[in-house]
Amino acid sequence: MSKKDSSRRWMREHINDKFVKNAKKAGYRSRAVYKLIEVINKEKFIKPGNKVIDLGAAPGSWSQMAIKAVGKSGQVIANDILNIKPIDGIDFLQGDFTENSVYEALLNLTMNQKVNVVLSDIAPNISGQPSVDIPKSMYLCELALDIAIKSLTPSGYFFVKVFQGDGFDMFVESCRTYFSYVTIHKPKASRTRSKEVYLLANKLKPAKLM
């Protein structure tokens, strides 16, 4: 399929997509919010009063959902290389979290307190070549895992988008090394042909606490 045909198919699907329509009606910035909502409803992993870090937050729909879930007593810190239009109640930090200065700034926003949830919906710029895209994605997942290990409370949750392919099984095993519970989810809002799945990890193992 040519890039032109692929773009046309994407546009047709986008226009007719119920999640796109629902997101617009509900005021969310992206259909991706329904991937998060489905797993939150199932696993109850964001609660009132929680502190949440949202990595790769643009355009902001996950942060919108997270701030609703944590309420005024909680905190949501969003980070992305891209700018995000302001969202009420969200602390936004623009920059590359793989850089030490940005990572330290993230921790400063938490007032150096441990957080309850780390979200990551990060994806690299897609080239269309799985042999290039998947390793880039796995690298970002590993960096997000590192932040989760260093910033989560012992009972905290790490929720991350992962693409199935080379390195997937190894990443899952890495998460199982650090967390007591790891589950894989394929939300209904995730397109069937997409290789993306979402991993939810919970409860850092005592020996792995930073």
Swiss-Prot record:
Transmembrane segments: none
Signal sequence coordinates: none
Molecular functions per Gene Ontology: rRNA (uridine-2'-O-)-methyltransferase activity
Reactions catalysed: uridine(2552) in 23S rRNA + S-adenosyl-L-methionine = 2'-O-methyluridine(2552) in 23S rRNA + S-adenosyl-L-homocysteine + H(+)
Location in the cell: Cytoplasm
Residues reported in the UniProt entry to bind S-adenosyl-L-methionine: 60, 62, 80, 96, 121
UniProt KW keywords: Cytoplasm, Methyltransferase, rRNA processing, S-adenosyl-L-methionine, Transferase
Pfam family, one: FtsJ
EC class name: transferase
Catalytic residues (positions): 161
One Gene Ontology term, aspect cellular component: cytoplasm
EC number: 2.1.1.166
Entry-linked InterPro entries: RNA_methyltr_RlmE (IPR050082), RNA_MeTrfase_FtsJ_dom (IPR002877), rRNA-MeTfrase_E (IPR015507), SAM-dependent_MTases_sf (IPR029063)
Family the entry assigns: Belongs to the class I-like SAM-binding methyltransferase superfamily. RNA methyltransferase RlmE family.
Main function: Specifically methylates the uridine in position 2552 of 23S rRNA at the 2'-O position of the ribose in the fully assembled 50S ribosomal subunit.
PANTHER family: RIBOSOMAL RNA METHYLTRANSFERASE, RRNA METHYLTRANSFERASE 2, MITOCHONDRIAL
NCBIfam families documented for this protein: PRK11188.1 (NF008390)
Name of this protein: Ribosomal RNA large subunit methyltransferase E
Organism: Vesicomyosocius okutanii subsp. Calyptogena okutanii (strain HA)
Gene, per the UniProt record: rlmE
